[in-house]
Amino acid sequence: PRLVKPVPFLYPVIKHYERPYVGAGIALYDVLATIGSRKGRAMPFHRHLSKKALHRAFPALSDHAAPGAIKYWDASVDDARLTLTVVRTAAAYGALAASRTQLVELTKSGLGRVNGAVIKDLETGTEYTVKATNVINATGVWTEETESLAGTDGGLKVLASKGIHIVVPRERIRGDVGLILQTEKSVLFVIPWSRYWVIGTTDT
């Protein structure tokens, strides 16, 4: 929980008829967030804002940019720190963690079941064989490459995506919340991040 920070966003409604269906979609988002929370809601429900309230929240927007907006809450997390926290927690419960290692081979039992791995210490070049009851492939965009080391195809296709973002100092854009804006083919995010704004699409 200490790594997750709530982030408010505005979705400017360009046309008045957008309010009902966009609001309904975000309301569903609220419902799912409530159902998925074990200890009650962690963030407020969405709100409909007038043109004046929109301008107060994000003065950098033109007065004529939109007749209003919908404010909703999302969250941000430092994924590197989250991963490190998971590793440290596992180590505290008795797991052995090894950084700077490379998977060389997945070993199999006589029945053809994966039962361990050969890993290489990238600092010394030494290879070790590790036996395991279960082996979990959590290698992200390298999932298929890892599967190939076992000589099998798990049927899971993972496609890499790329995002290009512009990073702008916070003082260059007057606003207190994030923005999600419709473009011709996609959406554009303006996300507050530390002392900066991160501006860009999800994928390119």
Say what each PLM segment does.
Residues P1-A57:
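Dinucleotide-binding Rossmann-like beta1-alpha1 core, especially the glycine-rich loop
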Residues L3-P8, E105, T129-T133, N137-T204:
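Active-site substrate-recognition segment that forms the wall
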Residues L10-K15, K71-A80, L96, Q102-E105, ...:
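Conserved short loop/turn motifs at secondary-structure junctions
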Residues I35-A42, H55-Y93, V114-V118, V130, ...:
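Helix-loop-beta segment of a Rossmann-like dinucleotide-binding subdomain
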Residues H48, A97, T129:
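Short aromatic/basic micro-patch
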Residues K51-P59, V87, L188-W197:
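Structured alpha-helical segments in the cores of large, soluble enzyme domains
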Residues S99-N115:
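A conserved short coil-to-beta-strand element within the FAD-binding core of flavoproteins
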Residues I119-T129, T133:
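A structured beta-alpha segment of the ubiquitous adenosine-cofactor-binding alpha/beta core
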